[in-house]
Amino acid sequence: MSYGDSREKILSAATRLFQLQGYYGTGLNQIIKESGAPKGSLYYHFPGGKEQLAIEAVNEMKEYIRQKIADCMEACTDPAEGIQAFLKELSCQFSCTEDIEGLPVGLLAAETSLKSEPLREACHEAYKEWASVYEEKLRQTGCSESRAKEASTVVNAMIEGGILLSLTAKNSTPLLHISSCIPDLLKR
């Protein structure tokens, strides 16, 4: 296993486990086992330990989700349709409960925001980054800056809540309900 391989495998395993089990439910030994990387490589690549690994996992998810949102928004001229396209894509993961990926950063944010300032900040930056994609599209289509900022925050909160509700329901109905409300939300 090469230098980059080992690091990427550790980060990939950690990202998936943090999404599914949270920060406190995920142990370093489990990450090592699932990644297949040598134990010493974890601290070599992540000298800051579990917290550094979690921050990098959040940053990976931030970029991954930002790109998914951007792709959906760019494919549509209407911001509401772009958001609905993202919600449709997101809701597909709930059609098979074995494939559910968990919360992109929500679980980590809820668990650690009061205990780890660097991890809280990483989660906050992820949410800001995602909101900025919605906000930019809304401004491009004539929405005022203040209204675009407000609407993007509401959309982000609705989606994060919808993911949580869909996880507990083990279906995509909450996300689909949110999707149907998006056009009216953006009209006001």
UniProtKB/Swiss-Prot annotation:
It comes from the Bacteria. This is HTH-type transcriptional regulator LmrA. Gene3D superfamilies: Tetracycline Repressor, domain 2 (1.10.357.10). The keyword Transcription regulation applies. Residues 27-46 bind DNA. The keyword tRNA processing does not apply. GO terms for molecular function: DNA binding. The gene is lmrA. Acts as a repressor of the lincomycin-resistance (lmrAB) and yxaGH operons. It holds the Pfam family TetR_C_13_2. Keywords: DNA-binding, Repressor, Transcription, Transcription regulation. Residues 4-64 form the HTH tetR-type domain.
